[in-house]
From Swiss-Prot:
Task of the protein: Involved in oxygen transport from the lung to the various peripheral tissues.
GO cellular component: blood microparticle; haptoglobin-hemoglobin complex; hemoglobin complex
Positions contributing to O2 binding: H58
Cited InterPro entries: Globin (IPR000971), Globin-like_sf (IPR009050), Globin/Proto (IPR012292), Hemoglobin_a-typ (IPR002338), Hemoglobin_oxygen_transport (IPR050056), Hemoglobin_pi (IPR002339)
Tissue: Red blood cells.
Protein name according to UniProt: Hemoglobin subunit alpha-2
Subunit structure: Minor hemoglobin is a heterotetramer of two alpha-2 chains and two beta-2 chains.
BP GO annotations: hydrogen peroxide catabolic process
Keyword set, alphabetical order: Heme, Iron, Metal-binding, Oxygen transport, Transport
Family recorded in the similarity comment: Belongs to the globin family.
Binding sites annotated in the UniProt record for heme b: H87
GO MF annotations, alphabetized: haptoglobin binding; heme binding; iron ion binding; organic acid binding; oxygen binding; oxygen carrier activity; peroxidase activity
Species per Swiss-Prot/TrEMBL record: Triturus cristatus (Great crested newt)
Length: 141
């Protein structure tokens, strides 16, 4: 459960993410695809090279969805309901991949904005990403 301090920390960190969703998202996805190649399973036939338009476009979608979740941090479940349905019923993504991607998102944030990712902010963002993962997997059965 995100405390009021966690929510404030996440919002503060996300002010530095806004406007960089494409770059951060592409970096996080690229790291996931290289370090954890099993994550490529859902992207057959897609150009997953580091500078590909597809990777940048999908990275922007991922991080923009998280930006939206931050904007609705008091109702993450409601704001991500359609995305949860899509991942559970249409895409059938292995829920373990959300853990992998969350790790690479945190790594990317630490790389691009180390001054923002203090230990307290790191903890809060990690809790936020865990909340998002829980919401995204809540409709799996």
């Amino acid at each position: 459960v995100l405390s009021s301090q966690d929510k404030a920390n996440v919002k503060a960190v996300w002010e530095h993410v806004k406007g960089h969703e494409e770059v951060y998202g592409a970096e996080a996805l690229h790291r996931a695809f290289v370090c954890d190649p099993q994550t490529q399973t859902y992207f057959a036939g897609k150009d997953l090279k580091e500078n590909s338009a597809y990777l940048h476009g999908h990275g922007k979608k991922v991080m923009s969805a998280l930006t939206n979740a931050v904007a609705h941090i008091d109702d993450i479940e409601g704001s991500m309901s359609k995305l949860s349905d899509k991942h559970a019923h249409e895409l059938m993504v292995d829920p373990g991949n959300f853990d992998i991607l969350a790790h690479h998102i945190l790594t990317t944030m630490a790389m691009f904005m180390p001054q923002c990712l203090t230990s307290a902010n790191h903890r809060s963002v990690d809790k936020f990403l865990s909340t998002v993962k829980h919401v995204l997997t809540s409709k799996y059965r």
